[in-house]
Amino acid sequence: ENPDNWIGFCQKRRFWITKEMQENINQQNINEYLITEPSKDWSKYDSIICKPINVSGAKKIKIIKRGWKNLIKDPLILFSKKKQNILLHFDMHHGYGNLQKAINELDIDNQNDFKDYVSKNNTFNPHIMFIAKPAIINKWFEALFPWLERCEKKFRIDDLVNYDTGRMFAYLAERYLSYWFKKNTKYKEENWVQLDNF
């Protein structure tokens, strides 16, 4: 294994692309848009992660319906997009308190920093997609998998059954990726596309 090689990960129907414009990408022309070689400017970076998605701005009725426990603690969530952060989004979509339960399984330094990250940010880099060199990938996996193994002991697998929680460990890894790569690497955000018609 060459330590200077870039290794990339994508996901089903989600691809790295060279241009931000996505509306004309389809199954016939996708090869014209795919990132197939490292860009020259990547030499200045340790990692490539997806351009972020924003989780703030949910409809008020959805916040009331799915985030009512959060609203009891802080009613201003309804009126302030800054308070509509990653933690609220996770609580609404993947079970109230589940992200905090997982954060408690991190080492103390990362516990505090990751809690701060999900509480202060309303964007994250999605899909557990990244491109990096082997040394960075090894460090990432050494940080991620022991944490997820500890989380497996805290979550009852029988309770993780539907869309909200069935892929709990992937949802946790997805949020942690943004934090970890931004904290531990010099990163660049690249374009990506989700194509549902393949």
Range-by-range predicted roles:
Residues E1-F198:
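ER/Golgi luminal nucleotide-sugar-dependent glycosyltransferases, focusing on the catalytic module
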